[in-house]
Amino acid sequence: MKGKFLKVSSLFVATLTTATLVSSPAANALSSKAMDNHPQQTQSSKQQTPKIQKGGNLKPLEQREHANVILPNNDRHQITDTTNGHYAPVTYIQVEAPTGTFIASGVVVGKDTLLTNKHVVDATHGDPHALKAFPSAINQDNYPNGGFTAEQITKYSGEGDLAIVKFSPNEQNKHIGEVVKPATMSNNAETQVNQNITVTGYPGDKPVATMWESKGKITYLKGEAMQYDLSTTGGNSGSPVFNEKNEVIGIHWGGVPNEFNGAVFINENVRNFLKQNIEDIHFANDDQPNNPDNPDNPNNPDNPNNPDEPNNPDNPNNPDNPDNGDNNNSDNPDAA
């Protein structure tokens, strides 16, 4: 389905900055030395198909002096085939805030869920319906998978700038994760410094609602903090960071001009939070036989073939097992 929406003038696009969305002067002075403990920085019933706002209704965010974090490695190119492969779940976001309409990025990771930043959802001022999502957007005239309206927001319980957004079905009763295949999350067991990565999203310095990919390398990795040498601008907030297998390893939040860009790295703590809140999120190793979370793994306690599972007929503690001394089975030599 090709959605037609009202044009947005790129001259008036209000971008969610990748440097700061908070008003405190201290937050604007983020240093790369404080990456491990940085304050958060920036860069219901069925709803009717959301509409793109007119240019005249768009207003810039205040205090956006660090909106663009363009580094010497400015390898950015447009993605025009947005509906195929790992590009399809990358999503253009508009937030209709009291002070104007702002843009950001996100990535679909479940049947009705998307990941983006806390500072993106904060722009809704507590009204989830203010956030609209357009997966696989090609440009301001072409939204091949239509639009979706948010209904619930869950912020990451840790310090990382990460949020889960749940969406209502569209007018055709389709879920956002049905019109596009949700992204695969990396288990990040092999992620390390100097690996090639990409950040894909909807930067505000490019034509409205056009998808762009930046290429670079990881330069720093510790805990939930990841830094890299590629370039982003306002509007990239919430963009997925992909590894060379096109798996999501982090969610871009912003950067420090002339120094680095950064993301929330999907480490074990973040992964556990996501699994607790998104039932159908898919991690790359979930299907592996040795993965303890795989229900087909014999060592999974929920697997009926697990020898320790009480209902396993081979379990000596199973009351139906003839070797169970408490069992009156006629085949049981200990039966009364």
Curated annotation (Swiss-Prot):
Residues 34-61, 283-336 are annotated as: Disordered. GO terms for biological process: proteolysis. Residues 39-51, 286-336 have a biased composition (Low complexity). The keyword Glycosyltransferase does not apply. Its EC number is 3.4.21.19. This is Glutamyl endopeptidase. It is an enzyme of class 3 (hydrolase). Residues 1-29 form the signal peptide. One of its GO terms (molecular function) is serine-type endopeptidase activity. It comes from Staphylococcus aureus.
